[in-house]
């Protein structure tokens, strides 16, 4: 009886392993998403990426709550790759020589997507006058400056040194209020957490009780955009770390004033919050593990 149980356990483990293993598709050789047929390409839960993954024929991968979870799944062989914006790939791949990404272009070799689906905007509470005020500030930032800032943030997150940021402004001497911004602080190069040693432009992270988290600093493209907006509006910036699924509820409840977290203004989200103009647009790519 014990021997039979042992055999059953072994068979079950093998079957589970097979179910959770990657496919036989060589992602590295793909030239378009059509070449990814049958591959297991994951995406983050609650994002447009989760819809885009359905464009890959025969894709059986699951969605994951965080990018770190997808990276773990990729490393373990549970998936063949995962969808990300190109800036994320620029931040992740140079720091790990086992990873690379497919340089796909939206609506040609890559995923079918509108600018609204692949662009990111700042979310605020429904009816807030912050939309117009923030849009006026964003209009001052040229496309070249936005691109150069993103490259810098990718470099910083990859451990490279940057001496001066492409986008900066003087903080107000006498702020007229506080701009509370929520983000994950875990989505390089858009936003991440520095521990103990803040990189250039990093700011303290606050907990949900309004207290500074000791030794934790937020940095990234989103942080620099938020800092620039706050400075131009004459406000003090405070960054709050939230799980992705808690970001929209935080704005709706009034716990924070806005979300700057690499968030796309999907129709579903537009029913819950108001969005500003885009502050960055990008191609969707697929990060994979080299064979």
Describe the function of each predicted region.
Residues 40-43, 55-56, 60-67, 72-76, ...:
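Extracytoplasmic small-molecule ligand-binding "clamshell" domains
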Residues 2-10:
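Sec-dependent signal peptide recognition
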Residues 25-33, 150-177:
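Bacterial Sec-exported substrate-binding components of ABC uptake systems
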Residues 51-56, 93-95:
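Short loop/helix-cap segments at secondary-structure boundaries that form the rim of catalytic
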Residues 22-36, 87-117, 231, 236-291:
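Acidic, polar ligand-binding/catalytic clefts
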Residues 20, 45-47, 112-161, 225-232, ...:
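Extended ligand-binding regions for polar small-molecule ligands
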Residues 14-18:
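C-terminal motif of bacterial Sec signal peptides marking the signal peptidase cleavage site
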